[in-house]
Amino acid sequence: MTFADELRELLPADLPLRDEVAAKAARHLDLIVEANQQFNLTRIVSPREAAIKHVVDCVTPWRLFKNADRVADAGSGPGFPGIPLSLVLPEVRFTLLESTQKKARFLESVVRRLELKNVEVVAERAEDWLAKHRVAIVISRAVAPLLRGVPLFAPALRGGARILFYKGPDVTAEIAEAAPETNKRQLRLRVIERYGLPDDLGARTIVEMTRVKS
């Protein structure tokens, strides 16, 4: 089966713009496969596994982002989760932050070829860009453990902003390990969503970081 076939089967039934998301997300995956030998963007090339781990995983918690005006995807890599989420939520502006120049150029080509009007690519370190710009939500997926992620993204918590970390099934120890960092900065980490992936390919947890109101 093709990427498009797999996505039409696997995407959540209640996903907004489901058919369009399936078509454009499949094209995104095709572009990754084309560029993979040159850029080493992913080790997952099986259509079904890629559809699940790269797209279904990214879009399942889409409701967490629907009221945001601007979202930053920190360390976007080949475009996950920012590009799949941008397909589901065309009214939300997404900024893909990727400091590796060759990956940023790849992302720019994807945005251009998929005609993603609500997406921009910035070839800059996430922490540097976030120090100068305000967004509603920062996404971190497979970037750093919470112990490093807390100090890295804490400066972005301005004006009610939130950091959402895509994590694996058990984050209890990771949250506890990061407690000294959150306590001294008056921040809070909490689990706000859990979900399983199709074909028993794992469970996911979304951890939210916010500033404690005084």
Residue ranges and their predicted role:
Residues 1-72, 102-119:
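Class I SAM-dependent transferase core
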Residues 85:
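Aromatic pocket-lining residues of Rossmann-like dinucleotide-binding sites
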Residues 75-79:
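Class I SAM-dependent methyltransferase "Motif I" SAM/SAH-binding loop
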Residues 82, 91-95, 99-214:
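S-adenosylmethionine
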